[in-house]
Every structure is written in structure tokens, then in C-alpha cells.
Amino acid sequence: MNEPIVITEKYKESEIIGCIITNEHIYKDDNNIIPIKAMWDTGSSGTVISSDLVKKLGLSPIGKSMVKSSGSSFKSGVYNLELLLAEKQIFGLQVTESDQLNNSDMDVLIGMDVITLGDFAISTVGEEICFSFRYPSQGLIDFKEQEIEK
């Protein structure tokens, strides 16, 4: 699967809880595609998987890495993972594990390693907030340049 993708989620301002959440999938094989809840996090350099999901998927670590998170550092397992976005595009990633996600409703935190592969935008009109991601990138989104061109 190597198709362009577009993800768009629209929220009412009152529905936003400080983060963007989408329903995505982990691809194990053609007969094993697991639905997950993913939080998009521009403050995270890499994608993170919950310890609970590691156990559920039966993943084995390929190594260890030091991870910095909210003022603390810890050693984390590193795993190969295939993230399926918009049920179209598979991203083969090396992700770290965190038990901090276990107490949330999130299975995966999508970091800048994925976000920087495409175009990412959040816009607001009135009470509506729109999150969009497209892959591959179709060029820079530059609001200042758009104003100059008007």
C-alpha cells in the first residue's frame, strides 16, 4: 500500500481536550489489523506505543533507548511497528514504549517522526477546529506568503 492519504477531523471547540486524537490501525499482516486510538503530539520527537499494546501485540524489543519525558528520563524498549494511517498508508517505524500511556485512552502517540513526513495543519473558524494531515507533502503551508500574494 503506497497511496496518498488525507486525514481530517473536525471538532467543536468544547470537544477539544487539549489534544488531537484519531482512530488508526497497527498492521501486523493482511489478516491482523488492530484498531488503535492515536494522539498526535508535536512535542514528541518520536512515536511511542503503550506498554499495554506491546503486550497485546506480543512485540519483542529490538533494542533499548533512553527516553526523555516531562522532566524524567528512563530506558525504554524499542520496537518495529507498522502504523496504518487512514486505512491506506503503512509507515514502518521504530517506536519506543511507555507505561505512561497505559492510564490514558491512547494506544499510540504519533510524534514528529511521522508528522514531518507530510503536511500537518490545525485551523479554527468560530467554534469549529479542523485538524488535517496529508501524505506525501504537497508543499509548504505558509500563511505569511499567502498574505503577501493577496
Sequence positions of predicted segments:
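Pepsin/retropepsin-fold aspartyl endopeptidases
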Residues: 1-150
